[in-house]
Swiss-Prot record:
Annotated metabolic or biological route of this protein: Amino-acid biosynthesis; L-tryptophan biosynthesis; L-tryptophan from chorismate: step 5/5
Superkingdom classification of source: Bacteria
Organism: Azospirillum brasilense
Protein name (Swiss-Prot/TrEMBL): Tryptophan synthase alpha chain
Subunit-structure text: Tetramer of two alpha and two beta chains.
Length: 284
């Protein structure tokens, strides 16, 4: 773990949540939604309902017009959110509103560097902390560019969560992990989000390999679509991450004009409850 990890990172909501999960003897469920998808009101309803539905940590996508690492489902969600007028500032407003009723559930912003750079790194970090953001996943900033955002984030007390993939070999892994904090996000399939699910034995072996290099929790995502798949991952990892399947469920509740049908938020939260049931029913 990096010397940059100060107390505000090490003892923050993410660390406390994983410690609580470990004490309960179970893995966590990490849910992803895109901020402002399909509109701010519906997104707000889903966001506020996620903890009660069983989400242990929340990833909130920062909409961007060119989400190159994402598959069609999350690309479409990002475009819907942008069309609805969602900005980085409004994304932080969503987190701020969430914190009025939930002081404990970790919120991680996930996205690309461009909107953060346009906002201004120092101002973004200050506003993110004030809003109640716990961590960042910025998929297009490799370790070689840590000075851009990763190191300022850690110094400010914001976790910087890095992705590891099946192609991250033992030579590359120390660089990936050096300034990572909060948890490691293992992408179980090399490619875009929402692709086919990975072989669980391979995922288990990959988690074991990561654990040899870091004491941080390991969350596994990409390709988890069902409660059964979430349960399989929960047996070998510290958390299962579900994103595209939730976003796809949300998209299925839109009318021909792309507007939310009545009951959409409740339907999405019902699906999250099913996923949480899978995760919580899995034994280590």
């Amino acid at each position: 773990m990096s010397a940059l990890n100060d107390k505000s990172v090490d003892n923050g909501r993410i660390a406390r949540r994983f410690a609580a999960l470990k004490a309960e003897g179970r893995a966590g469920l990490v849910t992803f939604i895109t901020a402002g998808d399909p509109d701010l009101e519906t997104c707000r309803a889903v966001l506020h309902g996620l903890p009660a539905a069983g989400a242990d940590l929340i990833e909130l996508g920062l909409p961007f017009s060119d989400p190159m690492a994402d598959g069609p489902a999350i690309q479409a969600a990002s475009l819907r959110a942008l069309h609805a007028g969602t900005t980085a500032r409004k994304t932080l407003d969503l987190v701020r509103g969430f914190r009025e009723t939930d002081a404990d559930t970790p919120v991680i912003l996930m996205g690309y560097y461009n909107p953060i750079h346009a906002y201004g790194v120092d101002r973004f970090l200050a506003d993110a902390i004030e809003a109640g953001v716990d961590g960042l996943i910025v998929v297009d900033l490799p370790p070689e560019e840590d000075e851009e955002l990763c190191i300022p984030a850690l110094k400010a007390g914001v976790n910087f969560i890095r992705l590891a993939t099946p192609t991250t070999d033992d030579k590359r892994l120390p660089a990936v992990l050096q300034n990572t904090s909060g948890f490691v996000y293992y992408v179980s399939i090399a490619g875009i989000t929402g692709a086919a699910s990975a072989d669980n034995a391979a995922v288990g072996a990959a988690v074991e390999r990561l654990k040899r290099h870091t004491d941080l929790p390991v969350a596994v995502g990409f390709g988890i679509k069902t409660p059964e798949q979430a349960a399989e991952v929960a047996r070998v990892a510290d958390a299962a991450v579900v994103g595209s399947a939730i976003v796809t469920r949300l998209a299925g509740g839109l009318d021909a004009d792309g507007k939310a049908r009545p009951g959409l938020a409740e339907d999405v939260l019902g699906f999250v409850r099913e996923l949480a049931g899978g995760v919580r029913g899995a034994a280590f």
